[in-house]
């Protein structure tokens, strides 16, 4: 009932981002801008020498993706999914924006604060690394318990 008929398609009319100080890429430039976005991200990841540099590249590219704002709706969700995708592609614990960090994340985006986005990304990736380590430990404990039975 509330499903848009243009879901999954590039925008055809200008859009705005509420609370943001930037103007999204015009529709006629979306495809070219996305091509440049991917090239720049992949180059930055190739040049990165550490996990932190990779997270920095991913978070900065997220800001660029949100500036392109290629769809009429769902750009935030797609952008955050791309953060997770590129973290996994680079074997980095994914940056998952939790509810408790939403305001900080939105403020960093709206203020175009690359440093804050990087710090948030590093912090959340580390939190996810610890969570994964705990889960692996719990699985091992359970498997040991099953073997002893």
Short names for language-model regions:
Residues 1-149:
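FIC/Doc superfamily catalytic core
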């Amino acid at each position: 009932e509330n499903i848009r008929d243009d879901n999954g398609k590039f925008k055809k009319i200008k859009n705005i981002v509420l609370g943001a100080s930037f103007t999204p890429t015009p529709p006629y430039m979306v495809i070219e801008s996305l091509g440049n976005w991917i090239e720049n991200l992949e180059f930055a990841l190739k040049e990165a020498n550490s996990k932190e540099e990779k997270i920095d590249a991913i978070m900065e590219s997220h800001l660029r993706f949100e500036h392109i704002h290629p769809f009429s709706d769902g750009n935030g969700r797609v952008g955050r999914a791309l953060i997770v995708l590129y973290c996994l592609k680079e074997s980095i614990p994914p940056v998952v924006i939790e509810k408790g960090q939403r305001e900080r994340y939105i403020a960093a985006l709206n203020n175009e604060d690359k440093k804050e986005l990087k710090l948030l990304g590093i912090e959340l990736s580390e939190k996810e690394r610890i969570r994964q380590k705990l889960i692996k430990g719990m699985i091992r404990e359970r498997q040991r318990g099953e073997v002893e039975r």
